[in-house]
Design a protein with these regions (language model features):
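Conserved ABC ATPase signature
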Residues: 1, 5, 341-345, 349
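Short catalytic/signature loops enriched in Gly
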Residues: 84-195, 208-213, 428-511
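Conserved ABC nucleotide-binding domain
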Residues: 90, 110, 321, 327-343, ...
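A short, proline-enriched helix->beta-strand linker immediately N-terminal to the Walker B motif
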Residues: 16-20, 360-364
Length: 511
């Protein structure tokens, strides 16, 4: 069974006793956005049909905006704010809620830093006195660390635990800080920039073996003929559902996986023809930040040893002379962290260590493979601010591999949408997100729950992504496509340019 089917089975088990209350604890966290949309639609239909109540536990604020009637915001074991969904998103009252919503990457925050919350959630075994959020609060005043806030009515049917709304302490409260908007960033070069990396017809097929003799009986077509241009100094995003081949493509570009066919050129040098020592100088210039900040760091090494791993791998005997402290400061960590071990750090701090390791060899090109997917919203904001700042200061070129379309809108300049091993649409973020052309891109964008969008048109796709071992004949998307035509079942659509920076593979646009 697929992930979506398994979740349906779990829902059926939960409904077997006809409950009055269904508690859905992160029911869609491990699912792709299109399957997530199906599950949310199913739960909502069941709620209406049976009259049961649903308690949704989630960290996805877009999902909350889309599905919930009322919202309770928790921090350090306390319900700090509770109100109608529209009221929370329109007029949040608790400083934690305010910062949480401001830390979500969206298109309208594209040219300014996200609101990151300093510090960490306190240990549940040693909560501080007074307000538990006070050590991290930008509005905290003298009373906050000393007195536990009361549960107050900030507005009709809007409850909040905060001294800012307590008449007894309001006179002592600090006024909200004046925020100075950042100047818009210069537009990223489009089309005219020098190509740092150029991929043509890249294929990565994995053999499927069977029997005692391990005969090859089929091939998994993980990447099946992809063209990709990454201009220097530009941030490119690869998006798509799980299993579409985006991570495999990223590894093939770095030559961590050898392409079955096609070519990958880095600054005009063909990488697929290089081996061993000839490839090593290019490995230094191309680095990767992995998805898992826990599994990607060796627990037996100190942070200083981890950061200089790349230097030692490239034969730099003077790796100890590299200023590890400065590198750690570059990614927002204290220099004293060099002597500590990974288990002493939070997920966000570990991801910063991974970024420092990648930067130690001074790369030109950085692949970020779901680099923030394992992090909380506020920690994600810190990492996105860091990547944005490093891109400006060091002139880095990024390839973001992600399913988080809010991140793409906030950070990327160009985007390529993948489906079952092939790119179906590509262009600037403004073009693709502003007016998606391919039916799959339209469904993908419609399925993403957003904190800043209401009344969106929903496009529910049937079924799951087909197997890359036996992809459908013709256009791979046709079994799920709401716009399917007879020719879609017969041949794969050719690439159709719509502008100098935009292409789509769909017969709807092929003359």
């Amino acid at each position: 069974l697929s992930g979506g089917q398994r979740q349906r089975v779990m829902i059926a088990i939960a409904l077997a006793c006809r409950p009055a209350l269904l508690i859905a604890d992160e029911p869609t966290t491990a699912l792709d956005v299109t399957v997530q949309d199906q599950i949310l639609e199913l739960i909502d239909d069941l709620r209406r049909d049976t009259g049961m109540a649903v308690l949704l536990i989630t960290h996805n604020l877009g999902l909350v905006r889309q599905t919930a009637t009322r919202v309770g915001v928790m921090y350090a074991g306390k319900l700090v704010e509770e109100a109608a969904t529209a009221s929370i998103f329109r007029d949040p009252r608790h400083p934690y809620t305010v910062k949480l919503l401001e830390s979500v990457p969206t298109a309208h925050r594209r040219h300014r830093a996200l609101a990151a919350i300093p510090g960490f959630v306190p240990d549940a075994s040693a909560y501080p006195d007074g307000c538990r959020f006070a050590p991290r609060c930008h509005r905290a005043f003298s009373v906050c660390p000393l007195v536990v806030p009361r549960n107050l009515a900030a507005a009709p049917k809007h409850r909040v635990e905060c001294h800012l709304y307590d008449p007894e302490f309001q006179a002592r409260a600090l006024p909200p800080p004046v925020e100075i908007a950042e100047a818009p960033a210069a537009a990223a070069p489009q089309g005219t920039a020098e190509s740092l990396l150029l991929a043509r017809g890249v294929e990565v097929h994995f053999p499927v073996t069977a029997g005692v003799l391990r005969r090859v009986v089929a091939r998994v077509k993980a990447v099946d003929g992809v063209d990709l241009v990454v201009p220097r100094g530009v941030s490119v995003a690869l998006v798509g559902e799980s299993g579409c081949g985006k991570t495999t493509l990223g590894k093939a570009l770095l030559q961590l996986i050898r392409p079955t066919a096609g070519s990958v050129a880095f600054q005009g040098t063909e990488l697929t023809a290089l081996r061993g020592r000839d490839l090593k100088p290019f490995r230094r210039r191309m680095q990767i930040v992995f998805q898992d900040p826990y599994g990607s760091l060796n627990p037996r090494l100190t942070v200083g040893e981890i950061v200089t791993e790349g230097l030692r791998a490239h034969g730099r005997e003077d790796s100890s002379a590299v200023d590890v402290g400065e590198l750690l400061k570059t990614v927002g960590l204290d220099a004293s962290a060099a002597s500590r071990y990974p288990h002493e750090f939070s997920g966000g701090q570990r991801q910063r260590i991974g970024i420092a390791r990648a930067l130690a060899v001074r790369p030109d090109f950085l692949v970020c493979d779901e680099a923030t997917s394992a992090l909380d919203v506020s920690v994600q904001a810190q990492i996105l601010n860091l990547l944005r700042d490093l891109g400006k200061r060091l002139g880095l070129t990024y390839l973001f591999i992600t399913h988080d379309l809010g991140l793409v809108e906030y950070l990327a300049d160009l985007v390529s949408v993948m489906y079952l091993g092939r790119v179906v649409e590509s262009g600037t973020v403004e073009e693709v997100f502003g007016a998606p052309k391919h039916p799959y891109t339209q469904a993908l964008l419609a399925a993403v729950p957003r904190v800043d969008a209401t009344g969106r048109k929903r496009i529910l796709l049937g079924g799951d992504v087909p197997s890359p071992v036996h992809p459908p004949a013709g256009c791979h998307f046709h079994p799920r496509c709401p716009e399917v035509m007879p020719q879609c079942r017969e041949s794969y659509p050719p690439e159709t340019p719509l502008s100098t920076s935009r292409c789509v593979r769909c017969f709807l646009y092929h003359s």
